[in-house]
Structure formats: structure tokens, C-alpha cells
Amino acid sequence: MEHDEQRARRDRELGMDRPITRRDFLNGVAFGVGAALVGSGLGPFGSDAQAASFAQDAPGYYPPALTGMRGSHDGSFDVSHALRDGNFWRNAGTPENTRETYDLVVVGGGISGLAAAYFYRARTSPSAKILILDNHDDFGGHAKRNEFRPGGRLLIANGGTAGISSPFAYSPEALGLMKAIGIDVPALSAAARRAGNRDTFQGLQQAYFFDKETFGADRLVIGTPGGGGRGRGGAAGGTTWAEWLTKTPLSAAAQKDIARLQDAKVDYMPDLTNDQKKDKLSRISYKTFLLDYVKVDPSVIPFYQTRTHGLYGIGIDAVGALECWAYNYPGFEGMNLDPKATGRMSFTARGDATPKESYNFHFPDGNASVARLLMRALIPGVLPGTTAEDSVTAKADYSQLDRDGAPIRMRLGSTAARVRHVGAAASAKEVEVVYGREKKLYTVRAKGVVLACWNMMIPFICEDLPAQQKEALHYGVKVPLVYTTVALKNWQAFKKLGITGVNSPGMYHTGLRMELPAPIGDYRSAPAGPEDPVLVRMTRTPCKPGLPSREQHRAGHADLYSTPFATFERSIRDQFARALGSGGFDPARDIDAITVNRWPHGYAYEYNPLWDADWAPGQSPCELGRKPFGRITIANSDAAAAAYTDQAIDQAYRAVAELAAGKAL
């Protein structure tokens, strides 16, 4: 009882009882759009398709304005989970035949699916009939857009895929698509630099927050020493590691060893050649390297454990030491390693170690802008305007997605339940697609189908695939992650503390930072002063240290699906209060809105040399899994085993080319 009273009192202090801007409802209708789908006790599907009226057609339907739990929102995964568990068809009933026939059906409305529709039309005819199905209440897949209006001012954030970048140069096909929809990255980057506003937070530093649960005491340490690569953080006025560490609650042994690790130039494998060193480093984790070769005290590990979360969704216990060398983590400065990549490196690390032409840009809503511009190209009435710049503040009209007579149509809240050839795959002229939408089942037919959904679902919806291909599709386990955005009424606490963000290696979210201004077109997000509202970004990648990488991801899936929004909100408020409290931050007063973009199935699984085999060319699971099957081909980032937008586009191009080669166009 006493514990419950303490919990209730703490909740009041955090503001759990305070109203925040919550838009889980539009026009009195609860979202997500699939909330009534099959599941425990929800009853059977119906089959009445006559005069159907769907959520996306209603006036005011606008998912980017929703807050609360987003990403894979409730209702978006019911059908998929029922198919996985083998109980969907028990209550599904007989699908209603829409009598619709298309040239192409695309399952999955993310960037890969939209690109597949674009490439198909370009390869065939401007009047090609295409239907795109997606299980979420918004298009874009992981490339989602979040909108906030603190104080009545429009602020935009990405709810998933963040930027136009890749470890390797974009292919001609991916680059050509970008240019065709109006994205000229060098020009956009130059315009953003001319627009300025990036000096808004000039003079402010990063900070570290050490939490008592992990490090023995709550302590905010402003500034970060060192500099250099992605793994090191920013500089802090020439402060040495030894000086900075004295401000932390870390033990004397940990402080001594971290300073040694960061500053010393030691060859920890002096008897090995360059190639032998790289091979050895590829077969041990960075944690093992620190403990067994650098000989750090075990109390050092928590300081570095979560540093690889943002790239891999797992900690340094499950990421190879050679990967961390590629990202300039400490400990390798004296090992005299040549700068070349090796075959025993992940896709991302291999790219980071390979010189290439830089290609990088971040829209305010991340790659949701790529999806929106693709939608403009496919269905012009969806997004007004003519340029990438004017698209940022343009409001999408979702009622235009599925118009009678339009050559290209998109149906949201529509989960594919079965995809199979009408007849034998080798000789069939059509493919039948059954999908669930708002507690009804429908069928359509097409000359060809591109499955641009997640690989692990394909064996459940396309049961006729060969067993070896199904096994390959099941191999990759998508990386769970959370992108949380918090709208604050002001950033006075940040200003008072002299910081832009806080690294929190031991907390529920591993950091928080104010969103940098991203001026483009008419959009201006830079606050005039500390009294103006800002957006703060947080990330979480649940995992279970000690297990192999794929098992850690599975544990993370379960964690995210079982965690209610209230748990996220409580942890967010607690983290803000503890990290920024000394600057006067009051979570009950200063938080305006919270959006948690929950992605239990987030990044495409990238092969990890520490855990995965060295497959021969053409024999990796993604290559075996993406083989065409009759009039069905596969496009998604899983098919490349690389979580990058250009890879998703390249796989779409390949999938459409395979349809053409099979004469399915």
C-alpha cells in the first residue's frame, strides 16, 4: 500500500495526471484503422463489400496529426499476428470478390512499395492499373511523418526513417528516382545552409546523465571530452578525459581505465599481421575486446554498452570489435590497421570504411517526404504543389488515395492475408490477393504482385512458396526500435544548463536532444528564443544482452508489443525530470505532447559477422528469399539485408524488372 501511494505521488509530480495534447481520435473515431480486426474474442470477418465506406475517405482524416502511440499502432498487426499464430482462417469467413482486376498489386505502401509502383508504371504505361495495400493508417511504411502544434505553431518530425543517406553511393536507379520526384540533394543542402538558423543553439554543449540504477548516483555532467568519430561525442573546450571523468559517479578504476582506453595508443595484438588482426577483431565482440585485450575493469562496460544501439539495436556485447573500429570507437589508435574494409564486416561498417561520394540530407519529417513526393507522382491529387520544397508544408488529402476510375489506388488499413496464383505458378495468368480491411475480407486479382511487405510475413501470406525460400525469408529478424518525439512548451531548462541534449547510456531511452532547425521552403522550425516551443528526440532499442543478436531482437519485439503507452510516458517524464531538473524543468508544466513511434519490427536485419555465416555469393538468406515466384516478386529493404532507403528503392527496381523478365507485365 505504501509503495502504491509513493508511486501515485511520484506520478503526480511527473504530471501523469496532467492533460497533454493527445490526438488518438479524429472525428470521434478511435485509431488505428484496423482496431476491429480479427483477434482474441473479436469475432469473425464479414464479407459485405457493397457501398463500403472506409476511414481514409472520411473528412478530416489526417494521421500525421495523431500523437500517443504511433509507428506500428494498435490495429495494424492483428491480422498478421493471427496468420502467424495459425488461427486467422478459423473465423475469417469467405472473402467478398470485388471483381477488381489490376495490372499490378503492391503489398506494402512503404518507400519500396511506392517505388515499385513508380517503376512499374514507368516501364509499362501511364494508364497502368495499380493497387497498393498497406496495413497501417498512413502511407510510407517506416517513413512516417509526425506533426505537432505547440502554441499553435507547426513543428514536424520524422516518425521513422530519418535521412537520405547510405554507407555506399546511391545506384543510378535510386538516384534517378530521387531526381524524378524532385529531390536534388546537393541543391537542397545548399539552400538549407543559405537559410541559416543553425546557430540557434550555438555555444550549447552535449551532456551525459548518469542514472543511479546503473551508475550508483544521478548526476548530470555537462560537456563531453575528446571528439572524433561517431562513437566519441563532441568536444568540450579542450577538457581531457581524466578531468571530465572526475565529475562522474564512476569508480576510480573505471575512470582510470576509460581515460587509458580513450587516450592511449597501444597495439593490443602486437604479434598479428594487419589481416590477422582484422579477422580476429571480426570474431570477438567489442565488449570482449575491452575486457580481454584492453583489460579494462568490468565497471567500464556500462559506459559503452548502449553506444551501438542506434546502429544495430544491440549493445557492444553482440557487435564485433571490427565494426566498432570502422566507427572510430576508442582502443584501435595504436593497432596500425590499414583503412580498408574487409569481407567480414557488416554492410554499414563496410560502407563507412569505404571512401565514397557523400550523399546526405534530412527533411524535417525524414524520409516521409520521399514517400509523400512519390505519392504526388503516383496520385497527383494527394499532395498539392510542384517541388520538394513546397511539399514540406503541404497537407496531404487522404480522400484522394482510392478514387473510382483512378489508375493508381491505395488502401490503408488493408492487410494482405493470402496471395496465390490462379492455377499453377508456372502457367498462371493472374494472382489472387485476399486482404482484410475494417473487419471485412476482400479479393482482387492482378497480372502481377510485388510483395513489398516485411520478409517474415511473406511465408504466411504466400503459402505456395518453396520450403527453402520460406526458410530464407524467416531468417532475418527485424530490429526493434522506438523513435519518441516530445513537444516542449519552451527550452529554458536547456538554455540554463547550456546544453542541446543529454546522453543517458543507462536509461529507458538512451538519450534526448533538441531537434536541429531544418529550414526548407516555407517551413521554419528555429525558435526565436528559449521561451518558444521545441521538439526533443529520444530513442530506445530494447534488447537482451548476452543472447545472440537475432534472439535479442525477438526479446525486443515482445518488450515493445507488451508495453503500454503509460509506461513510455512515465519513463519519459521521469527521464526529463531527472536529467533536466537542475535547469528548472518541470515535466508536469513543460511537456505539451508526446508521440511514441513504436517499431517492434524496425530496421531490416543486417548480417552480423559475429553471429551469421559467411555465405557464398547468391546464397545469403536475403538473396534466396527474394527469388521471383511465378507472377510474384519481392521488394523491401529486408531483401537487401540493409536498412537504407536506397536499398529499398533498388529492390523495388529489381522486383519490377523480374516481373518484366517473367512476362508478367
What is each residue range found by the language model?
Residues 103-118, 133-136, 416, 448-455, ...:
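Conserved beta-strand->loop/alpha-helix structural units within folded catalytic cores of enzymes
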Residues 17-18, 24-48:
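N-terminal export signals
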Residues 256-414, 425:
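Active-site/ligand-binding neighborhood in enzyme catalytic cores
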Residues 56-93, 147, 212-214, 218, ...:
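Conserved flavin/dinucleotide-binding core of flavoenzymes
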Residues 1-20, 47-50:
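N-terminal secretory signal peptides
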Residues 70, 74-78, 84, 89-279:
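N-terminal glycine-rich phosphate/pyrophosphate-binding loop and immediately adjacent elements
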Residues 412-547:
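Mid-domain catalytic core of redox enzymes
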